[in-house]
Design a protein with these regions (language model features):
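Terminal substrate-recognition subdomain of acyl/acetyltransferases
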Residues: 2, 155-166
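Conserved G/P- and acidic residue-centered "switch" motifs that form tight phosphate/ATP-binding loops
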Residues: 65, 99, 128
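Short amphipathic helical patch at the helix-1/turn junction of helix-turn-helix
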Residues: 91, 125-126
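A short beta-loop-alpha structural element at the N-terminal edge
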Residues: 6-21
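Conserved catalytic-core motifs of GNAT/GCN5-like acyltransferases
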Residues: 119-125, 136, 141-157
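Acetyl-CoA-dependent GNAT
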Residues: 10-13, 27, 31-94, 105-107, ...
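Conserved acetyl-CoA-binding loop-helix of GNAT-fold acetyltransferases
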Residues: 91, 97-114, 132-137
Length: 166
């Protein structure tokens, strides 16, 4: 398969349904996200609108006009932690293994720095070696392990806590 052409753009209202469908597709693989399906469309729409309204970094990758990946960074809710953001990212299975993930990550991290974030953190399943390698290449470091933190289909998985200081 050849490297698909794609474009990384800030998310807009017109991308909400595609974003929701992409999240649902990745979630249903039961491996990459901490959910088994996307939240209701209305909840996804409010998440996106809130990110747009508040200027939180959220980007999508478009291929053939369709959302094939996303990356967002939202601030921690508590005032004492709000200088830090939590990163979420996903790529449709059909578009993995190219440069989409790194391109999205670069865009979101650059915007996070402009927005004044000082720390970005994430959790990743310990067996998701490709994602861990991507994060390490971007400068994330492991801070710890949450043992048996995720349960998928009756099996427990450790989650790796990673962070990047901006």
């Amino acid at each position: 398969m050849s490297n698909p052409e794609f474009q990384v753009v800030p998310i807009a209202e017109e991308h909400i349904e595609g974003f929701h469908a992409a999240v649902d597709s990745v979630a249903r693989q039961r491996r990459y996200l901490a959910m088994l399906e996307a939240p209701p469309l209305e909840e996804s729409a409010e998440f996106v609108r809130n990110n747009i309204r508040k200027g939180h970094p959220q980007f999508v990758a478009l291929a053939g006009g369709r959302v094939v990946a996303w990356c967002d960074i939202v601030p921690e809710r508590r005032e004492t932690l709000a200088h830090g953001g939590v990163l979420g990212i996903g790529v449709l299975e059909s578009h993995r293994g190219y440069v989409i993930g790194p391109a999205l990550l670069r865009a979101a991290l650059a915007q996070a720095k402009i927005a004044g974030f000082k720390r970005i953190e994430l959790t990743v399943r310990e067996d998701n070696l490709r994602a861990k390698a991507l994060y390490e290449l971007a400068g994330f470091v492991t801070e710890g392990i949450k043992r048996k933190a995720a349960l998928f289909d009756g099996k427990y998985y450790d989650l790796v806590l990673m962070s990047l200081l901006l």
